[in-house]
Amino acid sequence: MQSAAASGTLEQRSQAVVDGLEAIDPRFVLYLPSSTLKLVLTHFLPGGPGHQPGRHVFPIPREEEGISILSGLALAGQRAVMIFQDNGIGNLLTALLTFPQPYHLPVFGIVTRRGGLGEYNSMIHTISERTEALLDAAGVRWFQLDARTPLGDWAATIERAYTFASTTHRPVFVLVNLMGG
């Protein structure tokens, strides 16, 4: 098992995600509010250091609506990212598999992991433990960032995953465990 120093603290992991997102320089940041994502989201919200003119940051009510918005932004050639929890993967599959996937749209998401080590909410485990299998079954490419990944690689992996989505013209998600598991 890796030590806390190897995997970093919540603050360090969140900052690594922020650094990766800033390297992408998204013009649109869509998100579902989450206490797990607080440090990442407050960076981009008004008053945060990542808030800037021309960057549109807004909450979305459901994951599938985020996929629709991301698809439109991809068609318009805009850099965009959606940030949400893995327990929302089930909600977005129909939207994902009927528009951006078959029409080769490079939608990109940062998906925070729930249900692993350090999870405090027992009901989350059932859906979250199946995230990778659901994405694999749907043919969606994903990359994993957790305690096994050196913290120094997180930002570059996020940036490369975004480039991968743009190059391959398909949806890509980065699964990020901010809770340390």
Which residues does each PLM region occupy?
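Thiamine diphosphate
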Residues: 1-181
